[in-house]
């Protein structure tokens, strides 16, 4: 199940507040969760089924015109503290670049954040397999088709802050 916004926001808030406490003049954080499922059928038989779940955080900190970014997939509190600390330490030793900064506040988007693009539909693995088996059956119902390169069903859900 995809993580709720509040879970991702909590991680983002922690990273931003910790980076400010350690000296960043500004910071940016991306917290994302992605779940991908793939099922493949070849010659009417299951050829493969994969599922992957990824959680990740990327923190960018600024100190004046210095900037550094660090990413992690470990969301433990100790690791997040280490992530922020390492990012701040890296920022301190990077050279200044006059173009390093976040956009001015007046340039930030102020409209509705929820674009309502998320599709809550979920098919079980068995439903996916039945769907693509049916597609292969239709292909094989034609006399001249004796082999296929297979059929597949892919589903990816993502949430990010």
Predicted regions: what they are:
Residues 1-161:
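Active-site bordering "gate/hinge" segments
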């Amino acid at each position: 199940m995809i993580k709720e916004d509040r879970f991702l926001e909590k991680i983002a808030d922690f990273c931003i507040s910790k980076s400010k406490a350690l000296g960043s003049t500004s910071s940016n954080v991306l917290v994302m969760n992605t779940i991908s499922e793939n099922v493949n059928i070849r010659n009417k038989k299951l050829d493969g089924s994969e599922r992957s779940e990824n959680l990740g955080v990327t923190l960018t900190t600024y100190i004046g015109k210095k900037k550094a970014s660090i990413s992690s997939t470990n969301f433990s509190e100790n690791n997040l503290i280490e992530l922020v600390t390492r990012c701040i330490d890296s920022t301190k030793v990077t050279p200044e670049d006059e173009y390093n900064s976040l956009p001015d506040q007046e340039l930030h988007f102020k409209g509705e954040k929820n674009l309502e693009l998320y599709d809550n539909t979920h098919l079980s693995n068995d439903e996916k397999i039945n769907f693509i088996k049916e597609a292969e059956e239709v292909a094989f119902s034609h006399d001249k088709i004796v082999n296929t390169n297979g059929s597949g069903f892919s589903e990816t859900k993502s949430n990010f802050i």
